[in-house]
């Protein structure tokens, strides 16, 4: 069986995900249609299926297709395998701290940016209501998240990654892409549901124009 999860949402809109990953599912990644990556604008992977992600990321790099990895909380050995394969290493704040063993997001970002300077063109961390931090030309940069009434944070990180990748592929500079992604993720948090709560592009652009 593929992975399943129960999601518990409290009265403040914060979510707890309780996942189940079937240990009997084959980890073989040989069936992946790797040749299709040459037509992709970007490959985005998370840390849930390390064999598949490693295979696809390695192939994408060989083909010259940009890669992005969602550096969420995972066993350290998994993060150590996947994050160096990311052109865009986009951590969650908790994932970044788990990867570095540090307690401060800004310090951790600077450390990873230095360590990955030969592998990654971008290192950043999404920090929920605190917005998005990244390192550019050796300096910390920040985009705040809009302050919203939170109903449900489920899938906010996924929305951020998708919107960020889209904006980058459309040629937006990182700051503008991060603003677009922060607004998209924040609007998602005002609605119940994961996929059902995703905002439309028109809604995100209308918010940006009004702010």
Language-model segments: what does each one mean?
Residues 1-41, 204-211:
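Conserved N-terminal subdomain of the carbohydrate kinase-like
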Residues 33, 79, 150:
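Acidic, amphipathic alpha-helical patches
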Residues 41-110, 131-132:
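Conserved beta-alpha-beta core of the PfkB/ribokinase-like small-molecule kinase fold
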Residues 35-38, 84, 118:
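Structured loop/turn residues at beta-strand edges in well-structured enzyme cores
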Residues 76, 105-211:
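Conserved phosphate-binding/catalytic region of the ribokinase-like
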Residues 20-22, 91, 145, 200-201:
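Active-site donor-binding loop signature of nucleotide-sugar glycosyltransferases
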Residues 14, 66, 88, 140, ...:
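Residue-level detector of anion-binding/catalytic polar loops
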Residues 1, 24, 51-52, 74-77, ...:
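Short alpha-helical
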């Amino acid at each position: 069986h593929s992975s399943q999860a129960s999601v518990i949402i409290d009265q403040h809109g914060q979510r707890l995900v309780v996942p189940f990953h079937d240990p009997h599912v084959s980890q073989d990644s040989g069936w992946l249609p790797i040749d299709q990556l040459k037509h992709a604008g970007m490959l985005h992977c998370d840390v849930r299926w390390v064999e598949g992600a490693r295979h696809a990321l390695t192939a994408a790099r060989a083909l010259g297709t940009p890669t992005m990895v969602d550096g969420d909380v995972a066993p350290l050995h998994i993060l150590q395998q996947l994050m160096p394969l990311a052109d865009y290493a986009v951590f969650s704040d908790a994932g970044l701290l788990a990867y570095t063993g540090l307690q401060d997001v800004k310090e951790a970002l600077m450390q990873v940016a230095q360590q990955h300077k030969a592998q990654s063109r971008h290192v950043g961390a999404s920090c929920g209501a605190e917005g998005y931090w990244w390192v550019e030309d050796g300096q910390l940069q920040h985009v705040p998240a809009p302050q919203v009434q939170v109903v449900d944070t489920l899938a906010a990180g996924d929305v951020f990654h998708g919107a960020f990748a889209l904006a980058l592929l459309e040629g937006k500079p990182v700051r503008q892409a991060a603003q677009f992604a922060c607004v998209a993720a924040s609007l998602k948090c005002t609605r119940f549901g994961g996929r059902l709560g995703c905002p439309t592009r028109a809604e995100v652009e209308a918010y940006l124009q009004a702010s």
